[in-house]
Amino acid sequence: ANLDDPHSLHRLKGLAGTVIHLAPPPSDGTIDRRTRHLAAILPRHGTVVYVSTTGVYGDCGGASFDETRPVAPANARAVRRVDAERVLRRWARRAQARLAILRVPGIYAGDRLPLERLKQGTPALRPEDDVYTNHIHADDLAAIVARAIFHGAPQRVYHTVDDSDMMMGEYFDAVA
């Protein structure tokens, strides 16, 4: 099946009561056509876990915040993620279904580290340009997805971050 081709999805309709939606939005436009195509085949009374991004909040200026902060996407990709969240919320209401939205920061794992950037000597951030950042290990994210499937409260947004309060420069130092 191909989320860019809605006809290819019809054969999947009704096959799964639980769906984990990890696909990124398309690279252009202001709507997430892929999520719209997926929502059209999702089952009534189903469960969906959508892996979104903390990027939907835009630039928070280093402030700490929780899931109640209004979204303020600052780039087209984040706008498409907000669109996907709204599409899935509408589906969940209409289908009397369970939806967990996981807002995820940078994902890291052994094969997902900025090693090439470090090997190439790409300059890191100057202290005056540094920003706070959060990350999550891929294994921790997988465990949270499983927990959201079985124990997540319906129609909830969850921040899935490591809560490290680390500057981006410190992150690069730790990786190095």
Describe the function of each predicted region.
Residues A1-P6:
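Rossmann-fold cofactor-recognition segment
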Residues A63-R86, V131-H135, D165:
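Short-chain dehydrogenase/reductase
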